[in-house]
């Protein structure tokens, strides 16, 4: 009965949050908008993002700031769900956190490999990652080369797959991205079997399998177009 009550509480929480998500039809409407101002007005009127957008100064309404606010909203939702979970469900939440970590590492790789003059813009993510992640943003932002970036991940699970790629010849950003994607899906595929029970596992594997298929299509397209 305890597990049933625990899950029912989470389901109630998630359904309440889901009810505030944008629908497919609303995304179609958004795609027809022509400016950031129109987008913000639409989100303020039609979505849960009103909570984080309504107080933004008009001078701050440009793409970079909007993306930051929406990402922080995502992290806020993760935090709300995580706090509501029991220990077993938190193990599942850690699998989701890995996706955020991969995105962070890929962002940093683009900065150092492409030698962007723009510095790392990650301070707004620090509080969230300090609380839930094995990655130290404070260490990552000191990197100026791929060697330094990989070494700054030495205390994490991502060090081994990245070092293996780093030590090969003529490595590209594409190679790093592919290595991280492969590691992410193979590791979470194994871990999910330890965490989830049969019905939950089947649902998660179906979802994860679809994402792997889409990723394969994406990589095939990129390989044909650029190589």
Language model features with spans:
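N-terminal domain-start signal
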Residues: 1-227
């Amino acid at each position: 009965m305890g597990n049933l009550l625990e899950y029912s509480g989470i389901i109630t929480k998630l359904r309440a949050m889901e009810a505030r998500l944008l629908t497919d039809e609303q995304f179609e409407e958004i795609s027809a908008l022509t400016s950031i101002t129109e987008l913000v007005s639409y989100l303020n009127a039609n979505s849960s993002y009103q909570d984080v957008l309504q107080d933004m100064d008009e001078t701050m309404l440009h793409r970079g700031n909007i993306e930051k606010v929406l990402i922080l909203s995502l992290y806020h939702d993760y935090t709300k769900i995580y706090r509501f979970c029991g220990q077993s469900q938190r193990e599942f939440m850690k699998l989701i956190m890995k996706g955020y970590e991969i995105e962070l590492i890929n962002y940093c790789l683009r900065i150092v490999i492409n030698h962007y003059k723009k510095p790392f813009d990650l301070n707004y993510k620090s509080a969230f990652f300090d609380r839930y992640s094995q990655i130290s943003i404070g260490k990552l932002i000191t990197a100026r080369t791929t060697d330094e970036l990989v070494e700054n991940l030495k205390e994490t699970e991502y060090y081994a797959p990245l070092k293996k790629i780093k030590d090969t010849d003529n490595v590209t950003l594409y190679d790093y991205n592919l290595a991280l994607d492969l590691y992410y899906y193979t590791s979470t595929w194994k871990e999910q079997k330890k965490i989830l029970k049969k019905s939950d596992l089947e649902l998660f594997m179906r979802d994860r399998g679809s994402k792997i298929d889409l990723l394969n299509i994406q990589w095939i397209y990129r390989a044909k177009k650029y190589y």
